[in-house]
Amino acid sequence: MKSVTLKDVAKAAGVSYATVSRALSGSPQIGSDTRERIIKLCDEMGYTTNYVARSMVMKKTDLIGLVVPSIDNQFMSELAYYAEMSARAHGYNIMLCNSGPDLKQEKTVVKILLGRQVDGILIVPQSPKTYENIKAYTDQVPTVFVSENLRDQPQSYVAADNSRGTYIGTKYLYDLGHRDILYFGRRHSTTHQLRAEGYMKACQELGLKQRFYNSEYSRSSIAHGYEMAKELFSHPIDYTAVFASTDSNALGLLKAADEMHISIPDQLSLIGFDNISATSLPRLELTTIEQPKRNMAIQAVDMLRDKIENGTQGYVHQILLPTLIKRSTCRAL
Amino acid sequence: MKSVTLKDVAKAAGVSYATVSRALSGSPQIGSDTRERIIKLCDEMGYTTNYVARSMVMKKTDLIGLVVPSIDNQFMSELAYYAEMSARAHGYNIMLCNSGPDLKQEKTVVKILLGRQVDGILIVPQSPKTYENIKAYTDQVPTVFVSENLRDQPQSYVAADNSRGTYIGTKYLYDLGHRDILYFGRRHSTTHQLRAEGYMKACQELGLKQRFYNSEYSRSSIAHGYEMAKELFSHPIDYTAVFASTDSNALGLLKAADEMHISIPDQLSLIGFDNISATSLPRLELTTIEQPKRNMAIQAVDMLRDKIENGTQGYVHQILLPTLIKRSTCRAL
DNA sequence: TCAGGAGTCGCAAACGTTTCCACTTTTTTG
DNA sequence: CAAAAAAGTGGAAACGTTTGCGACTCCTGA
């Protein structure tokens, strides 16, 4: 269990441990013969440099804190995957924290991460209030937000262009011949407000009537989409397509439609948003708008690295374009 | 960016920094009046203890390395969720690594984790060869494996009782009246061998004929399940139920069945394994065997903590019972 | 022969903690 | 009331590394 230190290999090599350190770090001020000898010896003795000691003197941990509401969520786990890959490729490691159900938890984990001396924090906010919640810490360490739109805040973030996503989607529906399109789902939270706006903008441009259906406290879940849709379908259906603010809600609506024998897409076209993995499943095949998760993750760690390594001040808002994924829940009229 | 240290608050409080350290750590050998004064001061000055310095002297990082083939995977992200929660509740943080596509990557990240001085490692193996692959490191740090069955290896692990899972499932099918049950999918890798064994045992006890269908290099994916199933259905269907070794494969089979107008469950009952989240989706509703992921995660970190904190030697094999989730792809004959 | 420079290498400080030991002050006890 | 015990505090070492600076060796050229 006792690991071998610099001092150990120094002793074995008959040099000072400064020399060993330099040999490993590729310092130019060292003989190439001794360097090789030492490197070989390190290998034999199974020496690996102790990162916590190193961090101590370098005042840099090469650690990035990743805080997500809960990693057990398609969007976030996918994001985490690419973030970790990209970070590691650049010599960083990821410290993972679930910011749990409430803001208190979120603040706690950020505090922990600070104590751990992470070089930067990547956070996907759990609510629009997150910014205020951790404001006190974001100036102590480079931070970039992912996926929640902080528009007016002086904070770096990368996000999908939600507004453009719904715009593209309704345009697609229009081109398919639909003239009565219902927007279904959440409208509060910045993200969902933007999605609604994209729909509204498209309607305006195309001369369509804007029609919304949502309950005040709607959440993005299949169960809730189902409940909402059952309520919705109890009224006459005087629209030919619905744009769900979220894939989960769309899936819930799908379930309700099945039960009520409303055929999708024959009677009703349906389009969602997020491209969660479930949408590509057999029997589902939901047409949707994809958030470019891979790019978001990569851009986010790039931004963070820039802040860390170059000390870049200020902030940048990186907006990525979503794309339409055509599957089989929409049909031409 | 410059954070406040022990020395800073010591100066402000007019005491030595040993005293401040003691006040914070709740040492008994300190006056309760000075303790309160110091704690209040720390709060005001926004002091948080530097964990890397602390780790240095304590020779303990309170860090657990979590290595998974890829976090963007239902099973693993869910596992990671519970593991992180449980770990943090006990004062540990999680360092996340994807062990990537190959064994080389897996070895690399384990090495990194060792350099980071993690107190322990939680690893879900990417292949049966994982054990051999990282053998050299597992005796340098407490390690527990998750979900791959290392039966004969002197290594701690927690896993679902795969064999029992398939046993329960086929028994269920039998009780429903099925007498011709086909086992569909992978059979190599320890896990899947065990699953196959459970099916075989049930068949033996119940006097059923064992029937297998699989391709040599089958993987657990919907696409592959689909391909296999198309091939399968090109032969006459002289069985009334199929047990898929994996939910993903089951879903692929479902898709093929739909295309060939084979009705499930009317013509064919279907049962999967894993209870991935997709199985509970509308239109799918796959009957399956659930791995108790939450329990697995919690047990795993408990085992690891025991090794870390109590220096427990030896190894334990923790086998958890899977449960049958009845949904709508099975019907009584 | 020797000054001086290039090329190597060692010494020691520093990073921010925790904790052992010693020391001072206060309290208890005989 | 003196001595011993207890309580509270400070000094300093230690953890394993990086790196500035000084020192040493060796060689070149005058």
Tell me the role of every PLM-derived stretch:
Chain A
Residues 69-77, 96-105, 158-168, 184-230, ...:
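Hinge/beta->alpha junction and helix N-cap segments in small-molecule ligand-binding domains
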Residues 230-333:
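Flexible loop/turn connectors
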Residues 1-5, 43-81, 89-92, 100-101, ...:
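N-terminal helix-turn-helix/winged-helix DNA-binding helices
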Residues 1-60:
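N-terminal helix-turn-helix DNA-binding module of bacterial transcription factors
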Residues 179-180, 210-213, 263-270:
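Short acidic capping loops at alpha-helix termini that bridge into adjacent secondary structure
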Residues 117-125, 182-185, 215, 236-246, ...:
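Periplasmic-binding protein-like
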Residues 85-134:
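Central regulatory/effector-binding core of bacterial HTH transcription factors
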Residues 101, 123-168, 208, 248, ...:
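Flexible loop/hinge segments that line or gate small-molecule binding clefts
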